[in-house]
């Protein structure tokens, strides 16, 4: 009797939680289908007018990416530069009056007689400026700065009196060196007792150069450019490896293997060349230059050969320095405004 009673109790509890069935609901689509369709605002657009734009947008072209856009910009506008734009180089100065270095009217050739003496025209001191003076008074600021700094360093090291003695000795050695060269290159004279002179190291330094020099035409001879109004005293005019050159002998304590190490010496050489070619005292024409840097310790000298093209370039620079000097002199002589 216990089992039926328990079962009845369970049924009564389940009846409490039973859910009543909802009445059936019918979904009707008739009203939706029969209702009036709303008009789309885009249908009012003139589609034919924009058909080309639609086709271009919906075309099957490659998708644009940041990389492709950058490449396109590079093609259209060039690559993006992260550096500053380079400043335009200053235009090279050109002389106002381009006087030629060579004399087209001169056809005379140098004499080849070994017994004839080289020209030795003395320098006449007058109001015409010398090549050395012109170059000194138009020295570029950078070159002048380094020269002054060298002087200050030497004075600190040697003192005022010591530096004066040093420069005096350098000048004396250079003078003796040129005197010895004049003796070597003159047919009538010979160098004697070279080893007892201070310049013996310099002479040893240029031995390999002397073997290639012949046909000496002038030694320690004055030149004057009648048209450009300047004078000078050249060291030598002779043939070097078969080319007639104005030769400038220089001494140095430091090696100068490059022509730019000689500073204004090339301008000095071409100034003498132009003067020789237009000086009535000389019948020949010089087309090349040679700078020989000799060393006191006897180490091989450095020869710097200047061909016709290089001489023409330095000649243009010399004309600029000459114009600068002339302009400075005009400014100095001009009367001050009242």
Curated annotation (Swiss-Prot):
GO terms for cellular component: mitochondrion. It is found in: Mitochondrion. Its main location: mitochondrion. Its EC number is 3.1.-.-. InterPro entries: PDDEXK-like_dom_sf, PDDEXK_AddAB-type. GO terms for biological process: mitochondrial DNA repair; mitochondrial DNA replication; mitochondrial genome maintenance. Pfam families: PDDEXK_1. Keywords: DNA damage, DNA repair, Exonuclease, Hydrolase, Mitochondrion, Nuclease, Transit peptide. Residues 1-64 form a transit peptide. The keyword DNA damage applies. GO terms for molecular function: single-stranded DNA 5'-3' DNA exonuclease activity. It is an enzyme of class 3 (hydrolase). Metal-dependent single-stranded DNA (ssDNA) exonuclease involved in mitochondrial genome maintenance. Has preference for 5'-3' exonuclease activity but is also capable of endonuclease activity on linear substrates. Necessary for maintenance of proper 7S DNA levels. Probably involved in mitochondrial DNA (mtDNA) repair, possibly via the processing of displaced DNA containing Okazaki fragments during RNA-primed DNA synthesis on the lagging strand or via processing of DNA flaps during long-patch base excision repair. Specifically binds 5-hydroxymethylcytosine (5hmC)-containing DNA in stem cells. Belongs to the MGME1 family. This is Mitochondrial genome maintenance exonuclease 1. The gene is Mgme1.
């Amino acid at each position: 009797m216990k089992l039926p009673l328990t079962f009845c109790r369970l049924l009564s509890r389940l009846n409490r939680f039973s859910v009543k069935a909802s009445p059936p609901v019918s979904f009707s689509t008739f009203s939706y289908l029969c209702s009036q369709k709303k008009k789309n605002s885009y249908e009012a657009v003139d589609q034919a007018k924009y058909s080309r734009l639609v086709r271009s947008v919906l075309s099957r072209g490659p998708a644009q990416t940041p990389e492709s856009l950058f490449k396109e910009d590079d093609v259209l506008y060039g690559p993006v530069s992260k550096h500053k734009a380079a400043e335009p180089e200053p235009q090279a100065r050109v002389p106002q009056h381009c006087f030629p270095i060579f004399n087209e009217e001169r056809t005379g050739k140098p004499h080849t007689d070994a017994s004839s003496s080289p020209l030795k025209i003395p320098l006449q001191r007058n109001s015409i400026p010398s090549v050395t003076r012109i170059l000194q008074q138009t020295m570029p600021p950078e070159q002048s700065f380094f020269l002054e700094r060298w002087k200050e360093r030497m004075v600190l090291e040697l003192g005022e009196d010591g530096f004066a003695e040093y420069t005096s000795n350098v000048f004396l050695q250079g003078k003796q060196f040129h005197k010895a060269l004049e003796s070597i290159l003159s047919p009538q004279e010979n160098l004697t007792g070279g080893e007892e002179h201070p310049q013996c190291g310099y002479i040893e330094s240029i031995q390999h150069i002397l073997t290639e020099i012949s046909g000496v035409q002038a030694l320690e001879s004055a030149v004057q450019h009648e048209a450009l109004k300047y004078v000078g005293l050249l060291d030598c005019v002779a043939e070097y490896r078969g080319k007639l050159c104005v030769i400038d002998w220089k001494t140095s304590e430091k090696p100068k293997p490059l022509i730019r190490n000689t500073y204004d010496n090339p301008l000095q050489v071409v100034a003498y060349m132009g003067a020789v070619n237009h000086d009535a005292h000389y019948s020949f024409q010089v087309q090349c230059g040679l700078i020989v840097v000799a060393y006191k310790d006897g180490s091989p000298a450095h020869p710097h050969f200047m061909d016709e093209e290089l001489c023409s370039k330095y000649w243009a620079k010399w004309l600029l320095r000459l114009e600068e000097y002339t302009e400075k002199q005009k400014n100095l002589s001009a009367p001050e405004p009242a």
